[in-house]
UniProtKB/Swiss-Prot annotation:
Protein species of origin: Taxus chinensis
Disulfide bonds: none
EC number in record: 5.4.3.10, 4.3.1.24
Molecular-function annotations in GO: intramolecular aminotransferase activity; phenylalanine ammonia-lyase activity
Crosslink feature (5-imidazolinone (Ala-Gly)) location: 175-177
Name of the protein in its database record: Phenylalanine aminomutase (L-beta-phenylalanine forming)
UniProt PTM: Contains an active site 4-methylidene-imidazol-5-one (MIO), which is formed autocatalytically by cyclization and dehydration of residues Ala-Ser-Gly.
Catalysed reactions listed for this entry: L-phenylalanine = L-beta-phenylalanine; L-phenylalanine = (E)-cinnamate + NH4(+)
Domain of life: Eukaryota
Effect of residue 80 to A/F: Abolishes enzyme activity
Biotechnology: Could be used for the stereoselective biosynthesis of beta-amino acids via amination of cinnamic acid derivatives.
Residue numbers binding (E)-cinnamate: 231, 319, 325, 355, 427, 455, 458
Oligomeric and partner information: Homodimer. Homotetramer, dimer of dimers.
Length: 687
């Protein structure tokens, strides 16, 4: 019984987003071609992506709408924001049409840059502003905002020239739209000297100079144009779009790394069996389980896991802890939340979200509230909770890796040793992960429940969508830290597992050879070999022949049991057997520590490069997670962590974090999942 192919939707969708991000060169803006969160993220993060405003598709309706507004305004029609005041002042009337629009922009340029205060970030990043300019432009293509085509062309030119205004970080309640942030885009278009524009990454000049440099002149706003520019959800939706691109990629990354965790922890793959999820058919649960089942299918580490649980199996837990065993059930609502949020944000991206909506075909202006960003605001809260859920799962799994009683044979703190009194492995990361998780859980608290009435009680409910999107972006940055730490730890665990296998072979070879040399009976030899395989190697690696550590204790106990059970065996007297066992112990002390130390030192020096010298890496070579291991160890040039190594954990985790933040991590992700949906290899930037 297997999974239905149709259930692979979210994996397919996310891989599609990654490919779209990589491949897009031009974003068509025409009011009919959908713009996705991947397109928005690509424009925000890649300077080679251009915007193409398609006149053939939308110019006629834009100009018809603009002409209708101008005609009605000149005729003295009573239309909100055209011949009336704004918000709570809509009872006021005026025929000073252009002055009214410029007055609106002037009063909304009320943000403050808090340079010198903590936190130091006091402005929205250029990525958010460029994305907002794109979404405002797209909103106008529906032909119901009343703005001139020339203003839209100017926005297109500014985007393609990489010119955008500096915008204060705070000040928007996202209803009536993102008024204050959007006023800075309007301020750039009208050439307000107080508005500072960025040109590229380094140049900052006043708005009039920025316009001049790209061959534009300041606009004198006509009726409704100022209101159309500021009265929308574009900033909240812009940030939400890049947030959703990242959330999708990180979701798939966490899901995939759950499989890698199963391998290194010696988890049982049974938790992903299709029948378990068929009888509880939540879509996200089925999809996550299907992915994990495929990732673990034919895993070479599962062979080691089955061997591990076959020894003293009645003394070992029958099932894995929740962080692995219930991961599909835990991920189920997170998958669904992120999927639904993506759909919602993309709906907002492809919408006209201002007021009033001009229905020129029926000769009317419809006064509504498409500027209300509650759909974005609420879903940003939901996504932040989902992100906290992903972080909690990582924290639980990471904790299992750090504790020797839970990690099925791995050393505490994932310390390579051998002297654990001076090697604390990844203990610092363990502490940091607790800090990250705590902050992430705090950020999961909702923003949208903290609404205050604004603007003279006219905006008595508002969405806080931009604030919520910003906080979700912040949460994602913490999740990236947690993923970087967890992936670093799992690569360390892979190294330790492979060293463990090599060391066990050394112990078995030495025990077998010495048993033969000392003339021990076959059943005695078998008992000793059983102990050599059963005792976790990291419990005695620091001093293999210490009589107080588990290996020698186990071997002695086995010998004692043999002597008690057998007074004679194959003609050997008990006294003779005791003498031979004593000789075995003496020779063991002479040989075992030296041979184990030689293997450990070689691995510590060369790590994954020992594959050139032996078959220590045979397990990871056959794993679907090899692309991640190679990427971290080879592409990022990290190494096995030990007390003798000069580098600190921070240096390695920083490299992994940077690769997540700039999107390089999607390279091994795509390679890892290549066979799941037949996706081609690729690369990506900007997670």
């Amino acid at each position: 019984m297997g999974f239905a192919v149709e259930s692979r939707s979210h994996v397919k969708d996310i891989l599609g987003l990654i490919n779209a991000f990589n491949e897009v060169k031009k974003i068509t803006v025409d009011g009919t071609t959908p713009i996705t969160v991947a397109h928005v993220a690509a424009l925000a993060r890649r300077h080679d992506v251009k915007v193409a405003l398609e006149a053939e598709q939308c110019r006629a309706r834009v100009e018809t709408c603009s002409s209708w507004v101008q005609r009605k305004a000149e005729d003295g029609a009573d239309i909100y924001g055209v011949t009336t005041g704004f918000g709570a002042c809509s009872s006021r009337r005026t025929n000073r049409l252009s002055e009214l629009q410029e007055s609106l922009i002037r009063c909304l340029l009320a943000g403050v840059f808090t340079k010198g205060c903590a936190p130091s970030v006091d402005e929205l990043p250029a990525t958010a502003t460029r994305s907002a300019m794109l979404l405002r432009l797209n909103s106008f293509t529906y032909g119901c905002s009343g703005i001139r085509w020339e203003v839209m062309e100017a926005l297109e030119k500014l985007l393609n020239s990489n010119v955008s205004p500096k915008v204060p970080l705070r000040g928007s309640v996202s209803a009536s739209g993102d008024l204050i942030p959007l006023a800075y885009i309007a301020g750039l278009l009208i050439g307000k000297p107080s508005v500072i524009a960025r040109i590229g990454d380094d140049v900052e000049v006043p708005a009039p100079e920025a316009l001049s440099r790209v061959g534009l002149r300041p606009f004198k706003l006509q009726a409704k144009e100022g209101l159309a520019l500021v009265n929308g959800t574009s900033f909240a939706t812009a940030v939400a779009s890049t947030v959703m691109y990242d959330a999708n990629v990180l979701l798939l990354l966490v899901e995939t790394l759950c499989g890698m965790f199963c391998e290194v922890i010696f988890g049982r793959e049974e938790f992903a069996h299709p029948l378990i999820h068929k009888v509880k058919p939540h879509p996200g649960q089925i999809e996550s389980a299907e992915l994990l089942e495929w990732l673990l299918r034919s895993s070479p580490f599962q062979e080691l896991s089955r061997e591990y649980y076959s020894i003293d199996k009645l003394k070992k837990p029958k099932q894995d802890r929740y962080a692995l065993r219930s991961s599909p059930q835990w991920l189920a609502p997170l998958v669904q939340t992120i999927r639904d949020a993506t759909t919602t944000v993309e709906t907002e991206v492809n919408s006209a979200n201002d007021n009033p909506i001009i229905d020129h075909a029926n000769d009317r202006a419809l006064h509504g509230a498409n500027f209300q960003g509650s759909a974005v605001g609420f879903y940003m809260d939901y996504v932040r909770i989902a992100v906290a859920g992903l972080g909690k799962l990582l924290f639980a799994q990471f904790t299992e890796l750090m504790i020797e009683y839970y990690s099925n044979g791995l050393p505490g703190n994932l310390s390579l040793g051998p002297d654990l009194s001076v090697d604390y492995g990844l203990k610092g990361l363990d502490i940091a992960m607790a800090a990250y998780s705590s902050e992430l859980q705090y950020l999961a608290n909702p923003v949208t429940t903290h609404v205050h009435s604004a603007e003279q009680h006219n905006q008595d409910i508002n969405s806080l969508a931009l604030i919520s999107a910003r906080k979700t972006e912040e949460a994602l940055d913490i999740l990236k830290l947690m993923i970087a730490s967890h992936l670093t730890a799992m690569c360390q665990a892979v190294d330790l597992r492979q060293l463990e296998e090599a060391l066990v072979k050394v112990v078995e070879n030495v025990v077998s050879t010495l048993a033969d040399e000392c003339g021990l009976p076959n059943d005695t030899k078998a008992r000793l070999l059983y102990v050599a395989k059963a005792v976790p190697v990291y419990t005695y690696l620091e001093s293999p022949c210490d009589p107080t550590l588990p290996l020698l204790l186990g071997l002695k106990q086995s010998c004692f049991d043999t002597i008690l059970a057998l007074h004679k065996k194959d003609g050997i007297e008990t006294d003779t057997l005791v003498d031979r066992l004593a000789e075995f112990e003496k020779r063991l002390s002479d040989r075992l520590e030296n041979e184990m130390t030689a293997v450990r030192v070689l691995y510590e020096k060369k790590g994954h490069k020992t594959a050139d010298n032996n078959d220590a890496l045979v397990r990871i070579q056959g794993s679907k997670f090899l692309p991640f291991y190679r990427f971290v160890r080879e592409e990022l040039d990290t190494g096995v962590m030990s007390a003798r190594r000069e580098q600190t954990p921070q240096e390695d985790v920083q490299k992994v974090f940077d690769a997540i933040a700039d999107g390089r991590i999607t390279v091994p992700l795509l390679h890892c999942l290549q066979g799941f949906l037949g996706q081609p290899n690729g690369c990506a930037n900007g997670v």
